[in-house]
């Protein structure tokens, strides 16, 4: 496999990608550049540097991408009120296009002719990484070891690591109970007991949130300030995008918000059960719909809702860098010009309740909407003609004998 001289590897420092690093060196006889992304996963990323150095890697990239992640990926997604299959807030999906982008940037900077990732051949991530890579660098070679090697169990990986002197932490022979992925938007949990769709998840699994039952008995109130569809302040204090999300995770988690247990349809064809912890995102979704409720035109809001499932599917299936997603994003962003104002929320035992919203760009007119005397602002007699015109097609059909009874 002499055609590959240098590979950029998406490297976490864990067992899988450490084995991949050594496997690439031996199988392709190539130089490996490692790239470790800090997306707010809450783990120290610097140990990955020491591991890579110990394995002979000379070019090591460890990048703090938290602000870019929230500003350029999470926030644009939430402008669309994006939810996949009615529940999933796409915490894993939205991180992959940024990682793919950075892999390609590093490949260009280092003269690498290939990239590699640790996604398995059963999951969505292989598709997300590779669609992004090919969109950004059409001629790049992608090496996906899980589709090539025979190391198809954790024990085989451990044995390979020990045989090749790869530093690992072996805790007996017991398999880790969950496969986890974390970033500033969420933590996902898969595998283990969760593979039985009838078995309830364990309370000890959750890392960011208390159970709703153990959340404080006193409600927490917060105010979120929006500018062009993005949160710019919490309780009147301006914050950067990453800090906004981190603070909402902390506040939401303390109130038992953001837990989810679902079975989703993977792009590769199978159903998969996952548990997700997304406290900040859960708050953001509720708040964004609230500020839009007073600032968006009715038909614009309805059109956004119609297009949202397609937009969500594009993100879930790895088409972030596609022309259709970019086209939808331009439309979504155009709709956010007047999405400005403040939303007040009540957080209590797993629930997020909107209790107030205000905006200088509000389309809500109390003089027209009032149940009291409106001083002629709205002529109720006009409704008769409106109703008759909208009933015309149904009246014609009924007169032609098309009875519905």
From Swiss-Prot:
EC numbers on record: 6.3.4.5
Catalytic activity annotation: L-citrulline + L-aspartate + ATP = 2-(N(omega)-L-arginino)succinate + AMP + diphosphate + H(+)
Record keywords, A-Z: Amino-acid biosynthesis, Arginine biosynthesis, ATP-binding, Cytoplasm, Ligase, Nucleotide-binding
SUPFAM superfamilies xrefs: Adenine nucleotide alpha hydrolases-like, Argininosuccinate synthetase, C-terminal domain
Localization per record: Cytoplasm
Residues binding L-aspartate, per UniProt: 120, 124-125
Pathway annotation from the record: Amino-acid biosynthesis; L-arginine biosynthesis; L-arginine from L-ornithine and carbamoyl phosphate: step 2/3
GO molecular function: argininosuccinate synthase activity; ATP binding
Main location: cytoplasm
Statement: the UniProt record of this protein carries the keyword Coiled coil: no
Residues that coordinate or bind ATP: 10-18, 37, 118
Sequence similarity: Belongs to the argininosuccinate synthase family. Type 1 subfamily.
Name under which the protein is recorded: Argininosuccinate synthase
């Amino acid at each position: 496999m002499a055609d590959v001289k240098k590979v950029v590897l998406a490297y976490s420092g864990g067992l899988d990608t450490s084995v991949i690093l050594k496997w690439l060196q031996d199988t392709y006889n190539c130089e490996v550049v490692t790239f470790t992304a800090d997306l707010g996963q809450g783990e120290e990323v610097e140990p990955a540097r020491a591991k890579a150095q110990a394995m002979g890697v000379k070019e090591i990239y460890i990048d703090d991408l938290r602000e870019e992640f929230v500003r350029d990926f999470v926030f644009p997604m939430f402008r669309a009120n994006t939810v996949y299959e009615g529940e999933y807030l796409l915490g894993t999906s939205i991180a992959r296009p940024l990682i793919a982008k950075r892999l390609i940037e590093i490949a260009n900077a280092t003269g690498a002719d290939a990239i590699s990732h640790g996604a398995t051949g059963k999951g969505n991530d292989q598709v997300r990484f590779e669609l992004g890579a090919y969109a950004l660098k059409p001629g790049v070679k992608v090496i996906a070891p899980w589709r090539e090697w025979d190391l198809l169990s954790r024990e085989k990986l451990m044995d390979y690591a020990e045989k090749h002197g790869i530093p690992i932490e072996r805790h007996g022979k017991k398999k880790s109970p969950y496969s986890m992925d974390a970033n500033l938007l969420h933590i996902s949990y898969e595998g283990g007991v969760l593979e039985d769709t009838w078995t309830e998840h364990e309370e000890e699994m959750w890392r960011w949130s208390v159970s709703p039952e153990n959340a404080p008995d006193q409600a927490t109130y917060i105010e979120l300030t929006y500018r062009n569809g993005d949160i710019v302040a919490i309780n009147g204090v301006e914050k950067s995008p990453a800090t906004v999300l981190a603070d909402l995770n902390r506040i939401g988690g303390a109130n038992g918000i953001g837990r989810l247990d679902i079975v989703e349809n993977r792009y590769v064809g199978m159903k998969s059960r996952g548990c997700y912890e997304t406290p900040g995102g859960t708050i953001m979704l509720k708040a964004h719909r609230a500020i839009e409720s007073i600032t968006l035109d009715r038909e614009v809001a309805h059109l956004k809702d119609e297009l949202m499932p397609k937009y969500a599917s594009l993100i879930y299936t790895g088409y972030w860098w596609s022309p259709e997603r970019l086209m939808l994003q331009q439309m979504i962003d155009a709709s956010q010009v007047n999405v400005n104002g403040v939303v007040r929320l009540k957080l209590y035992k797993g629930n997020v309740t909107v209790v107030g919203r205000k905006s200088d760009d509000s389309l809500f007119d109390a003089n027209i909407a009032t149940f009291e005397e409106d001083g002629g602002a709205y002529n109720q007699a006009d409704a008769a003609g409106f109703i008759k015109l909208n009933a015309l097609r149904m009246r014609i059909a009924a007169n032609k004998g098309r009875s519905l009874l």
